[in-house]
């Protein structure tokens, strides 16, 4: 329900309905409780060319948005660290991507917390490396093979379990015709198993073995991926002790997109942030 709907139902002006709603949101959600929070997820969301990026901090246990600020990186988190100190929150672990903009801020302000590099961001990066390899193969290929490889992006990056019908033989044929893509695809699929290991020791052995295999291929994009994983190994292996991810933020991201489509007057930045902070108690449905 939009503010216009609320105003019509209550026979109030749009401005009055907004003022009442904003006052209520500020009272109930303006300062999220931080005492007792143990696990954080930090990520950025993209809201279009005009609004650009927002940095979001999520309580990974109860799904609350604890902080939302325009921008990305260290600067967007400054006020949050102050609030954490005041609340004397004892953060055990933080899940974030491998961007130095976020993890360096975590190390600086939460030196006792464990930094966990997010599984889904790592797999996304692997997909990007594989897609870069596919583009290289397209540039090098000639004749029918060029078209064969060019049309495989969706098939290569998709989870093979979700492929249907003639998609499977199409993928098989493309991989059969191009050994570098075949090796890259197998490495992509094998990497998923890293987070299924049952101990830190097994996880470390798996990661080292994977990086060795990637190195043995001699493929530039796979060498680049292996180097990234080795460089960030400590935060990747921390998952064994603190199995957290920013996966919940993906669901939140979808809610935020729906929220923005409902046109709640978000030229008012403070109002938008309050709506985000209350999102865990809200349900939005687009009406056509």
Where are these regions (language model features)?
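Acidic/histidine-rich catalytic cores and adjacent linkers
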Residues: 49-51, 59, 63, 69-70, ...
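The DNA-recognition helices of helix-turn-helix-type DNA-binding domains
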Residues: 13, 24-28, 98, 133, ...
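Short, positively charged, Gly/Tyr-enriched micro-motifs
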Residues: 1-51, 88-91, 236
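Conserved phosphate-handling catalytic cores of large alpha/beta enzymes
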Residues: 130-147
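A generic local structural motif
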Residues: 26-27, 78-83
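Conserved beta-strand scaffold positions in the cores of enzyme catalytic domains, especially
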Residues: 39, 115-116
